[in-house]
């Protein structure tokens, strides 16, 4: 089975324009989270869309699904997210297992709730690549020079940009593989390894690159929100 896991566990309101976490802010005529879920609803191979939200916001998320996506709510599960990204993925996979016991071939397409401009092509590419690889990371080529500084004051390295990519989401892998690899980490490793695909890489797994889009914007600042609103208006 193919599942989607939407990471919506953040509670930050640092934009300073609302008491709502970013994923619940309005973008056009509906919340960012709803825009994101809608993209996954369009992919018929996805059995369930599991949304991991902070425990304080579970009821709010359920209300939004009832209001904006009543025809699809049977395909959507709202569950409690974790304290960080990877524990949220873990909770999402546990919710999938509660819905239907996991098999070794079950795949989860994980995605940031605040990237509402994901395309169906990106979702389908992730699913296709995940059939033949251990994991998939969605990326775009780096367009700016990346500078490394180990002390925050002086440049220590300027890597070859031709070999560099900017990571986005989705990140896709088999549910059981993630649970096994994450479970094998020490507490210290769990603190350091906050990116799911990095866990696969350091464990020697095959992580394929899926082509992202520069328009696959992650809305984290007021400027990002302004750009997103202009993109919605153009559509």
Curated annotation (Swiss-Prot):
Name of the top EC class for this enzyme: transferase
InterPro entries: IspD/TarI, IspD/TarI_cytidylyltransf_bact, ISPD_synthase_CS, Nucleotide-diphossugar_trans, TarI
GO function terms (MF aspect): 2-C-methyl-D-erythritol 4-phosphate cytidylyltransferase activity; D-ribitol-5-phosphate cytidylyltransferase activity
Residue positions binding CTP: 7-10, 82-88, 113
Pathway in which this enzyme or protein is active: Cell wall biogenesis; poly(ribitol phosphate) teichoic acid biosynthesis
Purpose of the protein: Catalyzes the transfer of the cytidylyl group of CTP to D-ribitol 5-phosphate.
Catalysis performed (reactions): D-ribitol 5-phosphate + CTP + H(+) = CDP-L-ribitol + diphosphate
Marked site positions, Transition state stabilizer: 14, 22
UniProt site (Positions ribitol 5-phosphate for the nucleophilic attack): 161, 218
Any Pfam family matching the protein: IspD
Protein name: Ribitol-5-phosphate cytidylyltransferase
Species assigned in the record: Streptococcus pneumoniae (strain ATCC BAA-255 / R6)
EC number of the protein: 2.7.7.40
PROSITE patterns: ISPD (PS01295)
Lineage top rank: taxon: Bacteria
Family: Belongs to the IspD/TarI cytidylyltransferase family. TarI subfamily.
